[in-house]
Amino acid sequence: VYAENPPQNEPRSEGGWEPLRWAYERARKSIERLKPDVLLVHSPHWMTQQGHHFLGVENLRGTSVDPIFPNLFRYKFGLDVDIALAEACCAEAQNLGLTAKMMCNPDFRVDYGTITTLLMIRPQWDIPVVGISANNSPYYLTLDEGLEEMDRLGKATRAAIEKTGRRAVLLASNTLCHW
């Protein structure tokens, strides 16, 4: 993954990853023009078995270390969470019958999907965030049930954004090998 990285990860070639890096550069410019109040990150790497969780700690800071390549991928991060919007998203999800809760552990280890997405799209770490977990229940539901669950989560999130008057951009973390 080549974005703004630690020195050992700086790109040294015009190889196959360049189009991906250029796409992130274009996305950054697009987001800059939108001037969002908040970035929402729905990450498949923060898996929850019971319901949908929302980050509920005002400031989360640390170093993310990749468990497979700890000497290559180390990112310092510092994110501020939009607690009011996260709580509104959680409440709206509950109102639509979803199991949802706030994650309020100050020692919570932020998942690498959230951190990497934010690092690549907004390396300044200057826009508040709402982190949303990936509820694993769709793996145990039919396709239609899983899609309906995600549709309700989207509607709840949209309602919360509208009620709070935020300008928001939704970022969906993913990897090229998740199929």
Language model features with spans:
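Soluble secreted/lumenal catalytic domains
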Residues: 1-179
